Regions:
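Active-site-proximal structural scaffolding
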Residues: 3-7, 33, 67, 98, ...
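His/Asp/Glu-rich, glycine-adjacent segments
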Residues: 29-139
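Alpha-helix capping and helix-loop boundary segments enriched in small/acidic/polar residues
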Residues: 24-31, 61, 65, 144-151
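A long, amphipathic alpha-helix that forms part
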Residues: 133-171
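Segments forming glycine/polar-rich beta-alpha architectures that bind adenosine-containing cofactors
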Residues: 1-30, 35
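Short alpha-helical segments and helix-capping/turn motifs at coil-helix boundaries
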Residues: 9, 23-26, 97-103, 156-158
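Composition- and surface-driven signal marking solvent-exposed, interaction-prone regions
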Residues: 7-13, 129-131, 174
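Beta-strand elements within well-structured catalytic alpha/beta cores of enzymes
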Residues: 1-7, 40, 113-118, 157-164, ...
Length: 174
């Protein structure tokens, strides 16, 4: 649910720290998180995931979470390409989890790949449809972008990006 207009707002905050190379890609349909993120992490289309890794795929009609196997899907992609990359995976659902990653950043630099899912924007999108208060706060697109930018400026995720910039690492935002 990370939209291009939200990226444009956040990229303004990052402009002093990073050099951007933007590449536009096509997306799979549907773009729902459970399909898109699982496809990115596995390097496969949803049907391929369900066929090749049925134990990692959760069907639409099942109650359990659809994105609970993202770290395993990353591992399957690394294994399929016969790579020996070390990686970490964190899903950041709140400020405390984000702060913990900032504190551990030195240890993570030894990995070939670090995957961080920042769930705030997804949660904001869902809250926008489910919560009357959030609908009022983000009653139009300009307000929605403003909330996104304000959150980023004031969140530990901003500090995480600053630390990544200081360490001169490549960051991919999607």
């Amino acid at each position: 649910n990370f939209r291009y207009d939200q990226w444009r707002e956040i990229s303004k905050e990052l402009a002093d720290d990073f050099v951007f190379e933007e590449r536009f890609c096509l997306s799979i349909l549907p773009t729902a998180t459970q399909y898109a993120r699982n496809a990115i992490f596995s390097g496969l289309m949803p049907m391929q995931i369900s066929q090749m890794y049925p134990d990692l795929w959760v069907d639409e009609d099942e109650e359990e979470g659809k994105n609970l196997n993202e770290d395993y899907l990353i591992k399957t992609q690394i294994d399929r390409y016969r790579r020996k990359d070390t990686f970490s995976y964190f899903k950041l659902n709140n400020s405390v989890e984000s702060e913990k990653v900032v504190d551990r950043i030195g240890n993570l630099m030894g990995n070939d790949l670090n995957v961080l899912v920042v769930n705030f924007i997804d949660m904001l999108s869902h809250a926008r449809t489910e919560s009357r208060m959030v609908r009022e706060l983000a009653n139009d697109e300009k307000a929605y972008r403003s909330i996104t930018a304000s959150w980023f400026r004031n969140s530990p995720v901003r500090e995480l990006f600053r630390e990544l910039a200081r360490r001169d690492v490549k960051v991919v935002v999607t």
